[in-house]
């Protein structure tokens, strides 16, 4: 089965063609980072306009790379949410038009589900897996029982981890996006600031990083940037958030018979997180998608669609709309 998938939930314009829920025939991604850097973050209006400019070209490139024609597509899948409503609508409108033109079935996919299935591209997700999803907009612990039964164990109560990375980087005048910059600087620093480990004095699996963000931003505002050891601040920040992720994950493992741990989402490309997770959970099969599949891209949407098509039947109505606040 050949699946055409489209992802435009934020600031990446991506189109992919995948085969049988495993093989990636093409996965074209255009990142808008340079368009948003001067603003220190994603500007929704700019993002949606850029998607409009690029979507047709990216579609053409995906077919060229896959060496297929539109007639050879069996299913069209598109990110329906969550995300920026203007950005989502560009991808959804493109999917509606393509599917209608070639009379192909159409399926809307949850972006978060896509991140989960990013691991399926190079690995095999097993029943009763624990999923730690860490991205720009979400921090979630999920129990993957099987393809039609995914339970949310813990979620973000305020700021998602990727968002906090960007705000700390902005306070340090490092630039955007903040995640890779902080990760790189932290490699030469030490945990000398011993920052708070937020929201651990409880028995649940939820996350809250707003207190840590406020504490660190206030610390930076009270001191001259030139007097600070930036690598040590980055290392201390990473040590704090990784400790929280490890502690919450351990808490789940004490209650559920998990044999496989999958860490996915944009923050899963962080080198320190990848290293600590693999060092800590030696008795588990710990899986990270390749860095190219951690960030937003359409291949993960196509893989998710292959497994979800029998759970949520595709439609020939071609009237999908955006669901910007979609959850699991």
From Swiss-Prot:
It is found in: Cytoplasm. The keyword Metal-binding applies. It is an enzyme of class 2 (transferase). Gene3D superfamilies: 3.30.420.40. GO terms for molecular function: iron ion binding; N(6)-L-threonylcarbamoyladenine synthase activity. Fe cation binds at residues 111, 115, 296. Binds 1 Fe(2+) ion per subunit. GO terms for cellular component: cytoplasm. Belongs to the KAE1 / TsaD family. This is tRNA N6-adenosine threonylcarbamoyltransferase. It comes from Phytoplasma australiense.
């Amino acid at each position: 089965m050949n699946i055409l998938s489209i992802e435009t939930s934020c600031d990446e314009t991506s189109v992919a063609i995948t085969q049988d829920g495993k093989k990636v025939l093409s996965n074209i991604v255009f990142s808008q980072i340079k368009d948003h850097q001067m603003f220190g973050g994603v500007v929704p209006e700019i993002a949606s306009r850029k998607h409009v400019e690029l979507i047709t070209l990216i579609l053409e490139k995906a077919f060229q790379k896959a060496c297929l024609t539109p007639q050879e597509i069996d299913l069209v899948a598109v990110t329906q949410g969550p995300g920026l409503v203007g950005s989502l609508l560009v991808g959804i409108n493109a999917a509606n038009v393509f599917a209608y033109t070639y009379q192909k079935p159409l399926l809307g996919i949850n972006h978060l589900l896509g991140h989960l299935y990013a691991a399926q591209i190079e690995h095999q997700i097993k029943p009763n897996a624990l999923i730690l999803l860490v991205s720009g907009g979400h921090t979630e612990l999920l129990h993957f029982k099987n393809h039609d039964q995914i339970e949310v164990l813990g979620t973000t109560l305020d700021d998602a981890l990727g968002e906090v990375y960007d705000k700390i980087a902005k306070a340090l005048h490092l630039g955007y996006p903040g995640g890779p910059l902080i990760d790189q600087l932290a490699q030469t620093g030490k945990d000398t600031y011993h920052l708070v480990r937020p929201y651990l004095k409880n028995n649940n699996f939820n996350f809250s990083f707003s207190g840590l963000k406020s504490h660190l931003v206030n610390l930076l505002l009270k001191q001259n940037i030139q007097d600070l050891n930036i690598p040590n601040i980055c290392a201390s920040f990473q040590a704090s958030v990784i400790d929280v992720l490890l502690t919450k994950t351990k808490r789940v493992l004490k209650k559920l018979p998990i044999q496989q741990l999958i860490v996915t989402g944009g923050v899963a490309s962080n080198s320190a997180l990848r290293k600590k997770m693999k060092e800590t959970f030696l008795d588990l099969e710990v899986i990270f998608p390749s860095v190219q599949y951690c960030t937003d891209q359409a291949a993960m949407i196509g893989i998710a669609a292959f497994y979800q098509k029998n759970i949520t039947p595709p439609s020939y109505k071609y009237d999908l709309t955006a669901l910007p606040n979609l959850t699991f």
